Curated annotation (Swiss-Prot):
Organism per entry: Anaeromyxobacter dehalogenans (strain 2CP-1 / ATCC BAA-258)
Ranges annotated as spanning the membrane: none
GO biological process assignments: gluconeogenesis; glucose 6-phosphate metabolic process; glycolytic process
Top-level EC class as recorded in UniProt: isomerase
Superkingdom of origin: Bacteria
EC nos: 5.3.1.9
Name used for this protein in its record: Glucose-6-phosphate isomerase
């Protein structure tokens, strides 16, 4: 019987991969392509409008076969089915994990504790659509009767990163007579700069907090309310300028928001998986209900692909499994996400939370320490071609092995002369350069002076994948996000970690709540931290002024 939750490194499937690595390790990508010139047309997969070329990864078809065998041995098909059925796969919190229900079509049945949640999802979507149409048309006015001109989303984590990324990604489809701003940091600078040039009478705040008690979000929301009331004077104005995305009606009412303007979601939606729930209200206002439905359709297409496609042709499974291969067997513990589209400039930051908060775990789902291997690769990146002039030097000639995901589109949203061909030429060139490099002989053949040959040599053999789609649309964005959501799930199953909790964020919160009282105390507090923290607190209190 397969061992689905035991130590990964002791499984026969893992040992088979280690034996395969010993055979493959000496082979450079140059040699792999020379031996098999057709791998660039075979080591590819398609789904939900996305094309994945993983032929420049340090894998062969045998590698993929062994990775699929590992996935089956670790129970990926069964765990995937359990998630789609609404079982409580978030084991540490005893919750279902059903972001897939947020994009399920009307009429589909998905049960949580015996209740079909799909009608509830569509009821919220319908309310969101009606409200978005009001704001977009000008039918929703502020307290003084002025039309809303700026929407400010106030949230943090998944309540900010997803909506902010989606707005920037879909600006080409956004309504142009509304401005959108996003406030997340408890640093007062974030809010102050966001509202500095706004007219309170024309500003609508969307406050996104499931409990309506999140420290950063509610601190910003309270300051935003004070800013509004300083200008408009009447507490009744709050009801026309604030909307809640929450499930805590009592706190929403206490804040001054009409519960009729509260949009809820469910405990089976994790924050970093929530951009297509009511958390995405700012996105719906920006691109309209129809654009949001297209976004959901892209999510759904990738959900169905992940659920139904064979693992060897399954995009999320391939990205997840090759990521495990790179991190745990090749030693590439970091992934550079490199979108060659300026609209996706916040996509790497979004993926940081999705991947690192999900799989950055040191214990298994059952609470035993992870044995002998890493989890949760470090994700980072910048849009191309900007990154080429900053950190690509390290990618090509540095001592760290960094796996790369290139993302590009065949059709530009703004066809300006040669711009798009130049952009895509750089994308293709970078993948080629990382894979094949430049030998010393090639450098000499170019006339490079001998003392410079070591500096002009590129080792190559740096793994990368390329994801191509025809055009960046709401639908392709949904598919792209769902691709990584399910890749994260795949890796969590292999590593046997709970990809849907985030206990690691708790300790800092508890300590901060204690320290803020010490910072605000009018009397000198009796500090009982370590020597460093005590000294820093005393220095801050002495020098903060005011």
């Amino acid at each position: 019987m397969p061992d689905r939750t035991g130590p990964l490194l002791r499984t026969p499937a893992w040992r088979a991969l280690e034996a395969h690595l010993a055979e493959l390790q000496p082979l450079h990508l140059r040699e792999l392509f020379a031996r098999d010139p057709g791998r660039g047309e075979r080591l590819v997969a398609d789904g939900a409008g996305l094309h994945l070329d993983y032929s420049k990864q340090r894998v062969t078809e045998e590698t993929v076969r062994l990775l699929v065998a590992l996935a089956e041995a670790r129970g990926l098909p069964e765990r995937r089915a359990a998630m789609f059925r609404g079982e409580k796969v978030n084991v540490t919190e005893g919750r279902a994990v059903l972001h897939v229900a947020l994009r399920a079509p009307r009429g589909e049945r998905i049960l949580v504790d015996g209740n079909d949640v799909v009608p509830e999802v569509h009821a919220v979507l319908d309310r969101m659509a009606a409200f978005a149409d009001q704001v977009r048309s000008g039918a929703w006015t502020g307290f003084t009767g002025k039309r809303i001109r700026t929407v400010v989303n106030v949230g943090i984590g998944g309540s900010d990163l997803g909506p902010a990324m989606a707005y920037r990604a879909l600006r080409a489809y956004a309504i142009r007579d509304l401005a959108f701003r996003f406030v997340s940091n408890v640093d007062g600078t974030d809010l102050a700069e966001a509202v500095r040039d706004l007219d309170p009478a024309e500003t609508l705040f969307l406050v996104a907090s499931k409990t309506f008690t999140t420290l950063e979000t509610m601190t910003n929301a309270a300051s935003a309310r004070s800013w509004l009331l300083a200008a408009l004077g009447d507490p009744r104005a709050v009801a026309r300028h604030f909307v809640a995305i929450s499930t805590n009606e009592a706190e929403v009412r206490r804040f001054g928001i009409d519960p009729a303007n509260m949009f809820g979601f469910w405990d089976w939606v994790g924050g970093r998986y929530s951009m297509d729930s009511a958390i995405g209200l700012s996105t719906m206002i920006a691109v309209g209900p129809e654009g949001f439905r297209e976004l959901l359709a892209g999510f759904r297409e990738m959900d169905e692909h992940f659920r139904d496609a064979p693992l060897e042709r399954n995009l999320p499974a391939l990205i997840g499994l090759i990521g495990v291969w790179n991190a745990n067997l090749l030693g590439a513990g970091t992934v550079a996400v490199l979108p060659y589209d300026q609209y996706l400039d916040r996509f790497p930051a979004y993926l940081q939370q999705l991947t690192m908060e999900s799989n950055g775990k040191r214990v298994t789902a059952s609470g035993t320490p992870v044995e002998g291997h890493g989890t949760g690769a470090i994700y980072w990146g910048e849009p191309g071609t900007n990154g080429q002039h900053s950190f690509y030097q390290l990618l090509h000639q540095g001592t760290h092995l960094v796996a790369c995901d290139f993302i590009g589109f065949c059709q530009p949203l703004h066809a300006l002369g040669r711009h798009h061909d130049l952009l895509m030429a750089n994308l293709f060139a970078q993948g080629e350069a990382l894979a094949f490099g430049k030998t010393a002989e090639e450098a000499r053949a170019e006339g490079t002076p001998e003392p410079l040959v070591p500096h002009r040599t590129f080792p190559g053999n740096r793994p990368s994948s390329t994801i191509l789609s025809d055009r960046l649309t709401p639908r392709t964005l949904g598919a792209l996000v769902a691709l990584y959501e399910h890749a994260v799930f795949t890796q969590g199953v292999i590593w046997d970690v709970d990809s849907f909790d985030q206990w690691g964020v708790e300790l800092g919160k508890v300590l901060a709540n204690r320290i803020v009282k010490e910072l605000e105390s009018p009397a000198e507090p009796a500090l009982a931290h370590d020597g460093s923290t005590n000294a820093l607190i005393r220095r801050y209190r002495a020098r903060r002024g005011g």
